[in-house]
Amino acid sequence: MVDFLEIGRVNKKGYTEIYPKFVLKRRSEDLMIRGGDFYAIWLEDRGLWSTDEMDLTYLVDQELSRVSQEIRDKGNVVKTLYMWDAESGMIDQWHKFCQRQCRDNFHMLDEKLIFSNQELKKTDYASKCLNYPLEEGNTPGWDKLMSVLYSPAERHKIEWAIGSIITGDSKDLQKFMVLYGPPGSGKSTVLNIIQQLFDGYYSVFDAKALGNPSN
């Protein structure tokens, strides 16, 4: 169970009521708060962090269901206040806990690439991973394509840029790469391959808007 959650119990006439009890920690290892609101939760079964609040709701409700069943197995009646049930008020209690009672406690996620053959740790702060391993191999298709589209010198620049992303050096390099040329010269082809290489780790922006002084 995550370190910021306990299951509260109240004995009432004829039944037991259970509810999620959110616990303040000096520094939670399973929950991140950023800007006074939920940022991420650690999902042990996936070995990843998640910024999807519905994953948190599911995890809490799963724990409530487990405790509820334990009580029923002892022959007792139980009323469970689930997070998914808006009328229970538990989701409101959760938002109050995050926004009013917790201090910011977070580490930026996905600051480095994670490959499918990499053993993940919580302190890798990853919410995603690439669907292929990082390992040595031959690239005949890439070699053939690049030999047609680019000179050896230009190909070297592109592969150097890709390599800097893989090693993480690109975060400190004050450089960027621009592909230019007439239609059909392979710009989109190379960009599409790079996007596939770093699926989930790239974003798209409007270069014209970026250079507009009014923005």
Predicted segment positions?
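P-loop NTPase catalytic core of nucleic-acid-dependent motor ATPases
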Residues: 28-54, 58, 106-215
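Intein modules and their embedded homing endonuclease domains
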Residues: 1-125, 129
